[in-house]
């Protein structure tokens, strides 16, 4: 790595501007020799990529605690011109939680694609889970990747599904999203019971071109070209939609020809309202406008094939597409004009030649229209039927068409039979029936139904039912085989019943007896009466939209030496379906006291327990108080001012918080309801991961003058709070990534990495994100303010002294992940810039107008927290930082090992014991988090602080050591 970098000083390195063609400025990295050896190679690429963004000034900067992140490296700093430059969510903060490269991601077209290949197919719609509607779909926002650690988590469910991923990747359970590393055997997870078919790259063969429409008006061709439907190639991005619309139209659609003064040609679709709504959604994706839904109720007289007559009240629903161009398009694809019962037609040749997943869409559309739904008699599925009727002279055409369907189904390992049924009025009717349990299961799991929500949901549940029925039968088959083996060895039935391998709800004494006494054949085994009937299964395991509950059977750590990937989506649900399983998808404050180490040490256990009780912590932790949605807007726009006004702090607190705890550009109307709801329930909580609350003592003072001004002396007890904007900040980032990506394209910004999605700062999109991000910063400050209030109350509870008398004043509060409007001197002139600090801290010098007057003589306090069991540093800002790093310095120790690797190496109890041996009381909502945050997982905070000090971008004032710590 040193051969790439140019040495500037002992602790400063330059990444040359010619490292990458697109770089507008060099990279500047602050590292000593030891930290340089620990640097991940991918970080150089991220530094270079940031240097390629428009409007960047001087350098793309990396702090001593730098490590790999999303878009920007964590520990990255960059300043962009406010008029010519950009703002990027990736430069503020975002998490990556990952799955293995071979995870199968289900798409809206019913096929799955390996996760590692998904980054090449970002225009796909993927399946997601909506708690109110069930199955939905979403555009892809991004696909991120990172290198894996040695071990990852593999979970296996009772139904045989397997998912592999990092320990921090969330999986949907009945209790919400839980990281894979925190799942337990026996936990229930939500799965989508559909396997689909593997994606196959279509050819670029032309299906239709202008020559097919040469006889028609040029407006027909223009209409289709404008919508990307001419020329129509097999690899058209909407070919799946086109195939399933055509399939449905062969069943419940028609091309109507009206002969009047002016000949009209239009397409009509028929079905239930919900069905037509879904069809209309697909048509919109093609740019085709459909009519409103026409409905009418009428009485019809029905006479069946056996001569019975009856009257029925029914509702007819239909939509029309009045475009003649679309009608001709569907006709050229193979759909007949006029009544289908009077027409000769076959399966279109292009469908026969298409990839399997395209055929799947055609068949799913056809069966969605005319196929019968899954029905059970006790435990057994009845055949799934497709019936066709035509006039007598078209009998051969019916048979030809159904035989073509039969051949298509066979490609999916689905057996079917065709037979004649009774018909009326000189017509002939034939039925194709999918028969046999295995074939029915294959149909439901590989094809299923499209557009008919009722058929689809029942079909999904039926598929899962048959899967689990097979598993139950397999258990009984193995029992029969094993019982025979043991019986031959002299083991009695009574002895077998006591063995663990025979303890299963589907194994009975009678089954074992029949196996050994009656020589029951394995292939003759029937399902146990303990197995639920289909309706009972739905009641017990069904979830809205055809999703089902599955139980984790096994969890293990496995070795994995390839990349891990994650998917971001546009929709608010922020999940996707991998291997059928639904998966998901700050700052620091120093508070001083007038207590000494000796005064606190005797009560440290009680104090930590009290703090743990009073300050909510842990993954998904929620605040103590409940707030209305309207109050959230006040929090987002007022920050700490709101908290103090509501009684959570002292008026003087505002003076010792960066920006007085409120960015004035915040506008809550730019924050989504989803983000607000996530923030509303979490306000006043610590969270999880590297967020913590630590009771410390000042071990050593390096700068007596600055320490005295900050109110710090040796042996004094202080409290460090490290937390941020919780789920709200993450949600804001997610909400704006897609907007920024589109904006980058619209403004002609070439991105070296899609994770650096951005927009010009002064653009509408840039300002919208900035206002929302300011809300996130205000929320984080308010969150730390409320925690400060409960810290003060906890000290009062334990020491029986008022917080005011304990002099529990804020030394300073500074943000870590933020983009801010600032003025800096560049090339001798004052320039307005937007400074991105991602995992970096502001470090303004003496006499800067943005810092408290009390600190003018020494500069802004800088807080660099260490990891559990090690030191933290209080430092001060400098003029060198203003000149070199836009007034920025490091924000902490910086991870050296990922959470997944830390979990592999250490156990939470072990870390807790080691801390106790050092005299540190540690409490956490999760033992896994204790392991993730093991001291060895981080770079040396001493090396980070030394590097900053040597570089002059912040200077040491004091070093603090922990007495007790609370981890989320």
From Swiss-Prot:
Record-listed Mn(2+) 2 binding positions: 586, 722, 816
Chain sites annotated for binding Mn(2+) 1: 95, 586, 691
Key words, A-Z: Autocatalytic cleavage, DNA-binding, Endonuclease, GTP-binding, Hydrolase, Intron homing, Ligase, Manganese, Metal-binding, Nuclease, Nucleotide-binding, Protein splicing, tRNA processing
A Pfam family of this chain: LAGLIDADG_3
CDD domains per UniProt: Hint (cd00081)
Binding-site residues, GMP: 690-694, 816-817, 865-868, 872, 891-894, 967
Enzyme Commission number: 6.5.1.8, 3.1.-.-
Cofactor(s) needed by this chain: Mn(2+)
InterPro entries from the UniProt entry: Hint_dom_C, Hint_dom_N, Hint_dom_sf, Homing_endonucl, INTEIN, Intein_C, Intein_endonuc_central, Intein_N
Gene Ontology molecular function terms on file: DNA binding; endonuclease activity; GTP binding; metal ion binding; RNA ligase (GTP) activity
Active site residues per record: 891 (gmp-histidine intermediate)
Cofactor note: Binds 2 manganese ions per subunit.
Family membership noted in the UniProt record: Belongs to the RtcB family.
NCBIfam families assigned: intein_Cterm, intein_Nterm, RctB_rel_intein
Known partners and oligomeric status: Monomer.
Task of the protein: Essential for tRNA splicing and maturation. Acts by directly joining spliced tRNA halves to mature-sized tRNAs. Joins RNA with 2',3'-cyclic-phosphate or 3'-phosphate ends to RNA with 5'-hydroxy ends.
Comment field (misc): Ligation proceeds through 3 nucleotidyl transfer steps, with 2',3'-cyclic phosphate termini being hydrolyzed to 3'-P termini in a step that precedes 3'-P activation with GMP. In the first nucleotidyl transfer step, RtcB reacts with GTP to form a covalent RtcB-histidine-GMP intermediate with release of PPi; in the second step, the GMP moiety is transferred to the RNA 3'-P; in the third step, the 5'-OH from the opposite RNA strand attacks the activated 3'-P to form a 3',5'-phosphodiester bond and release GMP.
Name this polypeptide is given: tRNA-splicing ligase RtcB
Organism: Methanocaldococcus jannaschii (strain ATCC 43067 / DSM 2661 / JAL-1 / JCM 10045 / NBRC 100440) (Methanococcus jannaschii)
Lineage per the UniProt record: Archaea, Methanobacteriati, Methanobacteriota, Methanomada group, Methanococci
């Amino acid at each position: 790595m040193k051969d790439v970098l140019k040495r500037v000083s002992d602790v400063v390195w330059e990444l040359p501007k010619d490292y990458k063609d697109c770089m507008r400025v060099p990279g500047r990295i602050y590292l000593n020799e030891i930290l340089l050896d620990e640097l991940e190679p991918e970080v150089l690429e991220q530094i270079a990529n940031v240097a390629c963004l428009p409007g960047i000034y001087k350098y793309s900067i990396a702090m001593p605690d730098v490590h790999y992140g999303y878009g920007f490296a964590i520990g990255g700093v960059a300043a962009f011109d406010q008029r010519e430059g950009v703002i990027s969510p990736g430069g503020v903060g975002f998490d990556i939680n990952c799955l293995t490269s071979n995870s199968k991601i289900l798409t809206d077209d019913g096929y799955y694609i390996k996760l590692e290949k998904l980054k090449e197919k970002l225009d796909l719609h993927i399946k997601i889970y909506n708690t109110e509607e069930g199955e939905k779909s979403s555009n892809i926002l991004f696909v991120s990747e990172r290198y894996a650690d040695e071990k990852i988590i593999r979970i296996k469910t009772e139904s045989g599904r397997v998912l592999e991923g990092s320990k921090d990747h969330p999986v949907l359970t009945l209790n919400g999203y839980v990281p894979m590393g925190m799942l337990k055997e026996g936990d229930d997870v939500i799965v989508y019971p559909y396997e689909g078919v593997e994606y196959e790259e279509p050819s670029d063969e032309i299906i239709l071109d202008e020559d097919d429409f040469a006889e028609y008006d040029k407006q027909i061709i223009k209409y289709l070209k404008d919508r990307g439907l001419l020329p129509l190639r097999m690899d058209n991005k909407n070919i799946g939609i086109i195939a399933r619309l055509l399939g449905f139209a062969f069943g419940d659609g028609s091309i109507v020809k009206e002969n009047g003064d002016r000949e009209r040609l239009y397409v009509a679709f028929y079905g239930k309202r919900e069905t037509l709504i879904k069809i209309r959604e697909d048509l919109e994706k093609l740019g085709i406008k459909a009519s409103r839904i026409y409905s009418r109720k009428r009485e019809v007289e029905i006479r069946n094939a056996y001569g019975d007559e009856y009257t029925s009240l029914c509702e007819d629903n239909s939509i029309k597409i009045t475009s003649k161009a679309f009608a001709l398009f569907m006709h050229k694809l193979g759909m007949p004009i006029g009544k289908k019962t009077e027409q000769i037609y076959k399966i279109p040749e292009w469908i026969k030649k298409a990839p399997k997943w395209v055929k799947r869409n055609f068949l799913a559309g056809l069966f969605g229209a005319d196929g019968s739904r899954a029905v059970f008699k006790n435990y057994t599925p009845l055949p799934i039927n497709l019936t066709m009727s035509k006039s007598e002279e078209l009998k051969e055409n019916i048979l030809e068409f159904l035989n073509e369907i039969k051949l298509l189904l066979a490609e999916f390992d689905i057996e079917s039979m065709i037979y004649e049924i009774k018909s009326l009025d000189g017509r002939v009717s034939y039925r194709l029936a999918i028969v046999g349990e295995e074939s029915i299961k294959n149909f439901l799991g590989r094809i299923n139904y499209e557009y008919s929500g009722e058929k689809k949901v029942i079909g999904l549940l039926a598929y899962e039912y048959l899967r689990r029925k097979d598993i139950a039968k397999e258990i009984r088959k193995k029992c029969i085989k094993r019982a025979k083996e043991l019986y031959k060895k002299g083991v009695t039935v009574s002895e077998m019943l006591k063995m663990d391998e025979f303890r299963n709800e589907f194994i009975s004494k009678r089954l074992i007896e029949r196996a050994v006494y009656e020589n029951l054949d394995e292939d003759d085994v029937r399902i146990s009466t303990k197995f639920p009937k289909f309706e009972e299964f739905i009641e017990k395991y069904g979830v809205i939209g055809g999703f089902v509950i599955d139980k984790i059977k096994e969890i293990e750590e496995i070795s994995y030496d390839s990349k891990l990937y994650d998917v971001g989506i546009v929709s608010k649900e922020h999940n996707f379906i991998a291997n059928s399983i639904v998966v998901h998808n700050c700052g620091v404050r120093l508070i001083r006291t007038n207590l000494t180490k000796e005064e606190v040490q005797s009560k440290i256990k009680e104090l930590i327990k009290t703090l743990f009780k009073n300050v909510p912590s842990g993954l998904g932790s929620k605040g103590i108080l409940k707030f209305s949605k309207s109050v959230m807007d006040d929090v987002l726009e007022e920050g700490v001012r709101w908290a103090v006004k509501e009684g959570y702090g002292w008026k003087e607190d505002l003076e010792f918080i960066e920006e007085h705890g409120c960015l004035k550009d915040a506008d809550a109307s730019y924050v989504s309801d989803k983000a607000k709801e996530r923030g509303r329930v979490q306000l006043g909580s610590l969270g999880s991961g590297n967020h913590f609350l630590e009771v410390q003592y000042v071990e050593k003072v390096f700068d007596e003058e600055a320490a005295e001004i900050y109110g710090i002396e040796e042996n004094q007890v202080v409290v460090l709070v490290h937390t941020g904007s919780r789920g709200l900040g993450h949600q804001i980032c997610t909400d704006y990534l897609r907007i920024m990506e589109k904006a980058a394209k619209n403004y002609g910004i070439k991105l070296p990495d899609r994770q650096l999605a951005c927009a010009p700062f002064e653009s509408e999109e840039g300002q919208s994100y900035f206002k929302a991000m300011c809300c996130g910063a205000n929320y984080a400050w308010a969150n730390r303010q409320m925690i400060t209030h409960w810290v003060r109350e906890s000290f009062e509870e334990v020491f029986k002294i008022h917080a005011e008398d304990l002099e529990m004043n804020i030394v300073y509060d500074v943000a870590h992940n933020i983009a801010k409007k600032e003025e800096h001197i560049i090339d001798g002139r004052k320039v307005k810039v937007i400074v991105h600090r991602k995992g970096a801290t502001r470090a303004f010098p003496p006499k800067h107008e943005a810092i408290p007057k009390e600190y003018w003589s020494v500069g802004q306090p800088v807080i660099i927290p260490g990891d559990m069991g090690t030191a933290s540093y209080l430092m001060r800002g400098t003029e060198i930082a203003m000149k070199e790093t836009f007034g920025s310095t490091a924000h902490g120790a910086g991870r050296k090992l990922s959470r997944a690797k830390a979990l592999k190496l250490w156990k939470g109890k072990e870390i807790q014991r080691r801390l106790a041996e050092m005299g540190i009381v540690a409490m956490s909502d999760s033992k896994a988090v204790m392991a993730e945050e093991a001291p060895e997982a981080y770079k040396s905070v001493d090396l980070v602080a030394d590097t900053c000090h040597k570089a002059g971008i912040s200077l040491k004032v004091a070093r603090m050591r922990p007495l007790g710590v609370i981890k989320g």
